[in-house]
Amino acid sequence: MTLITHAKRAVRKPGHRRPLAVAALLALCVTATLITLVFRAAHGPPAAAPTIDLEEHIREYIRHFPSDHEYRIPDAAQRAQVSEGIADIVDGRLDAAGRPLSEAGYTVRTVRLAGSHRMVAQVAEATGRGAQPRGWGEVFVDLGRRVQWSAQVPHPVSDQHTELLGAELFSRAPGGVLVLAGANRDAGRGNAADVAHRQDSVFQAVCAALAARRIPGIQVHGFADDSSPGNDVVVSAGPGEVGPGVREAARSLSSAGFTVCRAWDQDCGRLEGTTNVQARTAAADDVPFLHVENSRSVRDSRTARSRLAAALAEVARQLAKGGFTAA
């Protein structure tokens, strides 16, 4: 009997310890839950990315462009900082981009384009107390896929509605970058703010960083109707080789109903873009570049502008697929 009793007691001992183990486990779970709740209460839920109507944003943005002589030429360090930040974003290092951009007086945030699920990085000049108008522009980078093309707007306001054309083009074709100058081309002393013809601008620093990564550019401009009579659009490669992308762009625009002047075999009224700094940079890097001049009549018509953006967006999609080469 004594042996049996001891044996029964030996069997019961693990059973006595099991409730203690369960209680300890429950205590750990409760503690972990409390810690999680406290952390969430302190930091709040992840903030949803703000939605931005790109066209409305740009319309408001250009209203606050610098006045005459307020444009400031960025120094070499500032241009390098912006270039580094944009390169970080394009290379998928969004978190790393904040430091160099902030050093140049820029902010970066993620926004969602209205009417879509596309998330983009918005790079903008810092505002608030002490901020001075500089006119260096904004950049939008598609975060949904690898960057493969860019829309460039060097003369917003001066070439009226090219800023809206660039915005619609960027919105229609994924995988792009929108590079928007931040001042009227006459806002600086001399041609200081004419970023299409200056090496020392943030605009050029960004476009050069993209060209260094072999990202093609579509740059939109505007001309007075009487500068190239009878033409809606003038297409060229600037000083670069006229490759398949440039020729295909001309065909696409013609198919969309526009009268297209092909600068490589027609007299288009000196609108070829041969002195364009971004075009020269792309040519030096053997990167496809499309220089598109648009008549005032086309730019002033919302319908025509949308048809133009749709045709250029198809060219951008082909660029993204690697369908064209520089030569």
Protein language model regions, located:
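N-terminal catalytic or cofactor-binding beta/alpha core of small enzyme domains
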Residues: 38-288, 295-326
